[in-house]
Amino acid sequence: MRARAPYPAGVDEHYFTASPSAEDRRFPLSVRLAGRELELVSSSAVFSGHGLDKATSVLLDRLDEVAEPPTDGTLVDLGCGWGPIALTAALLHPGLRVVAVDVSERARELTAENARRAGLENVQVLSPEEVPEDLAVDAMW
């Protein structure tokens, strides 16, 4: 079995570190979510910061076939990154409470900013430690 080649410094730590050491270069991000063109913000220091990764894009394009969110209740987006899944769920179902959770402070900042830019009031952004123990969850992505 071959050993995995290490990533360059700082590349994979965004998955596990609240405050990664990689430079946080933020930039505008134009993206289409839930049929709306949105002007958001992203960073080089989060997963798939330059746009939708292929798997997320496929999921969002096929929600009606694989994972339609509930129309109300609470959906948790675990590992929200810059927010594409949380924002899509919130846009599709304004009556849904969306709780976006990420270990990365940068990802949480981006998701909160992007929810604000999209005019969404039904997105709550939390660190894993902030999630209430008694949170009733109807769906998790």
Positions of PLM-derived features:
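Generic detector of intrinsically disordered, low-complexity, polar/charged segments
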Residues: 1, 7, 32, 70, ...
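N-terminal auxiliary segments of SAM/dcSAM-dependent transferases
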Residues: 2-36, 44-49
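Glycine-centered flexibility sites
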Residues: 35, 45, 55, 79-83
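Generic secondary-structure boundary/loop-capping signal
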Residues: 43-44, 49, 82, 128
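Conserved SAM-binding loop and adjacent beta-strand
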Residues: 44-64
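Conserved SAM/SAH cofactor-binding pocket of Class I
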Residues: 58-133, 137-141
